[in-house]
Design a protein with these regions (language model features):
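Surface-exposed strand-loop-strand hairpins of Gram-negative outer-membrane beta-barrel proteins
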Residues: 34-56, 141-142
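Transmembrane beta-strand segments of Gram-negative outer membrane beta-barrel proteins
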Residues: 22-37, 112
Length: 196
């Protein structure tokens, strides 16, 4: 029985090692900005535009088979802005995507992605308390969103890459702002683990 257990463990480890051989993991940090249509006035109410400002972003992906994989990302406004000129707020965007990363040449890889996520608009100055989570100094307005994007990885040194990127966020029921469509564009610096 002991020999059978050892044989099964050795076989399982060899399967895991061979399947992990073809995988690639990438992580990146970048900065960008967002744009959207200009603010509007409806029924005497002003709806500002969800645009401008610096948006740091963290992203990570794993390529599993034939350059297809999964990607996750979070980006947020680096500093608070004023909503309607008086209320401090900060939008946070997060998404989970299917990713296709075809290799274009030795040093260039394209990225095409699509997925789902959300926008969390945090309005500051309001204290909210909960028995389970404690107290926070903001109130959140959350919205479901679709995410479509593209990027171009340019490997500049070994597995280090720079990536210009663009994202289209289609935000459901984005009542606080003038548009349901937001475009984020920027650049990232990243590293590929497990080859490229």
């Amino acid at each position: 029985m002991k020999k059978l257990t050892i044989a099964i463990l050795v076989f399982a480890c060899s399967l895991l090692a061979s399947s992990a051989y073809g995988q690639q993991f990438d992580a990146a940090f970048g900065v960008g900005t967002i744009s959207s249509s200009s603010g509007t006035i409806t029924n005497g109410l002003y709806f500002p535009s969800d645009r401008g400002g610096a948006y740091p972003a963290f992203s990570a992906d794993i390529l599993l088979h034939r350059r297809i994989g999964f990607e996750g990302e979070i980006s947020w406004r680096a500093s608070q802005d004023l909503y309607g000129g008086s209320q401090p707020y900060r939008p946070v965007f997060y998404s989970f995507n299917a990713l296709w990363a075809p290799k274009l040449s030795k040093n260039f890889t394209a990225e095409l992605l699509a997925g789902i996520g959300g926008e969390d608009v945090r309005f500051y100055g309001l204290v909210n308390c909960s028995n389970f989570f404690g107290c926070t100094n903001y109130s959140s307005s959350n919205h479901f969103m679709g995410d479509f994007g593209a990027g171009l990885r340019a490997y500049i040194w070994h597995n280090v890459f720079v990536r210009p990127e663009v994202r289209l966020y289609l935000i459901n029921n984005n009542l606080e702002f003038s548009s349901n469509t937001v475009v984020r564009y920027g650049g990232s610096l990243g590293y590929s683990f497990g080859g490229r």
